[in-house]
Amino acid sequence: MENTGLHDVNFSLRYDGLDAEKHEIELSSLGESLKGFSKILATAGTFALTQKYSRRPSTQEVKIYATEARANCFSLDTIMNFISQSQLFSGSAGAILGALVPYIFAKNSQKKEEMKYLKEALEKAIEALGNKDKDTISGLISVIDKMASELRPSVRQAVSPIGTTCNKISVTPGNGFKPAVIDEQDKAVIDQLDDDEVLGLREYRILPY
């Protein structure tokens, strides 16, 4: 299995519309958004690396860095770095991460078809790591669902510029997955959910693994 440094894994954040059309964005909105993305990406990166859900930054295995902004509407890339430089990131773990971040946004914006496709991709990536037992795979998917729900406050932060300084945000994994695109309609769905509620979706019980 191919291994790469986690710093080779990146996500591109693109803000479109309104102020972003002029290649600028309101600073406090950007700061709030990046705070949300930092939490989401660090939590997802740690899970992809360890298959563990670590809530506290002090227990997470990756740090998120931003590179120079680009005048592509308003875009910047994020780069993940290991806490421990001796660790390696497998291709299958990269596949988990590439599906996991879009899944977090799909679940919180109630996009059921995207959730179905991304959940299948997550199951295949988890299996490729050597987890052949169905109960183990189901248990890890349950943890992912719990993670996505508990990250809802960070998702709100990440999409907070929509409607004020941009019209939509695209989150593009660097490994072939389709970008997660969040627009004003999606933001309205995210904002209407309570922090412990996902409307119209089945909640998955966490199984021992």
Curated annotation (Swiss-Prot):
Origin: domain of life: Viruses
Assigned keywords, A-Z: Early protein
Name assigned to this protein: Protein 40A
Protein source organism: Enterobacteria phage phi80 (Bacteriophage phi-80)
